[in-house]
Amino acid sequence: MTTFIEHLNGVDFENRENVKIRDRYNASVPTVVGPVSRPNSVFVEDAKLLRQQTEQPIKWALPGPMTMVDTLYDNHYKSREKLAREFAKILNQEAKELEAVGIDIIQFDEPAFNVFFDEVNEWGIDCLEEAINGLKCETAVHICYGYGIKENTDWKNTLGSEWRQYEEVFPKLQQSNIDFISLECHNSRVPIELLELVRGKKVMVGAIDVASNIIETPEEVANTLRKALEYIDADKLYPCTNCGMAPLSREVARGKLFALSAGSEIVRKELSARAIA
């Protein structure tokens, strides 16, 4: 998030204000002091380098417009929607340049979609549509409950026995032009049947808990995927982690990724066996 925003004009990182982020915890954030713009590409050179290293598909993550707005103090536009739409234009520019150098999937991270439901449905998804406008590569939106920092884990403990936040935004997302929806499932209290609301979309099912150092077994991963398959067609299910693994050690992250791969292979073989039978 900060890595992208710090390359933009109109945002002052020295002039900071305390604001409530995700409507739950206070943080010192940069200030929007003028019109925002992107003077140069931010990640294109990195994307070129990565493209040279592999022939496999590459998914590149960018911050989503609403989440960018929620991570700043706006002293210029004085409107979350206006600022989000400006960010959507900037993200669209960056996304098109990433596509041009061979990125296959561009993902927009929108944890704010799990909090500001009215704004999501009024203008948040529209901003996402603006960010993907004209792209020929596949696109994704990632909505989770945050990785394993204390502010996020404390918040999760207040959400009760069922986490139904996805229910508020899935219907409109299902009708959007976004190709993939990336979700948190394993070790969460999200009712798995909510996936029915996005049937027809490609779904990245979070089968790895990024808020724990405990490495899942392949069978645990497989169980999460089996449950998801009750509501997602097999050709549209893409196993993934709940969120990013930045807070985890490399050893733990590597172990979790191996488990994700092994668990996915278990389910893949089960599906192949059924097809043959």
What is each residue range found by the language model?
Residues 1-277:
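Domain-level signal for soluble alpha/beta catalytic cores
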